[in-house]
Amino acid sequence: MIVDANLLLYAVDTESPFHARARDWLNSQLNGNQSVGLPWQSLGAFLRIVTRQGISEQPSTPAEAWKTIEDWLECDVAWVPTPTERHAEILGELVQRYQLRGNLIPDAQLAALAIEHGVEVCSADTDFARFTEIRWHNPLAED
């Protein structure tokens, strides 16, 4: 699996109504047996948002946010999926096929990574449903 930034953010944002479910899900995954992909794109978005003034009443310091990332990456099942030589071709196909613009481009980048590595995307973002080429799962959705 590849984890989108929104799940990482909800897992640490105690103000979010999704906090407990996201935290429990992420902890379960990071302590489980299945590989958990934490792309730099997701980690970078997490770092950008949790340290930003105005998003939260008490944003994380850069050191606190980086420590969280280090803790995740130290888990035995964590890995950082990187683009392969096919990334540009796959990303270009997705952008053109779905006529993507703006905020949908990062979703296409994660979808391309998922295709390259043959894994599912875990995200609370329903925009991933548009990509028929990938498996997408929202672990926060009501069963």
Predicted features along the sequence, with ranges:
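Acidic active-site catalytic centers that drive phospho-/nucleotidyl reactions
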Residues: 4, 107, 125
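Short, well-structured N-terminal submotif of metal-dependent ribonuclease cores
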Residues: 1-2, 6-38, 53-67, 143
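Anion (oxyanion) recognition and catalysis
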Residues: 30, 73, 115
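Acidic, PIN/NYN-like endoribonuclease modules and their adjacent C-terminal/linker elements
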Residues: 111-143
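Active-site neighborhoods of divalent-metal-dependent phosphate/nucleic-acid chemistry enzymes
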Residues: 77-122
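Active-site phosphate/pyrophosphate-handling residues
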Residues: 6-7, 44, 108-109
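Short beta-strand segments at enzyme active-site cores
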Residues: 37-40, 124
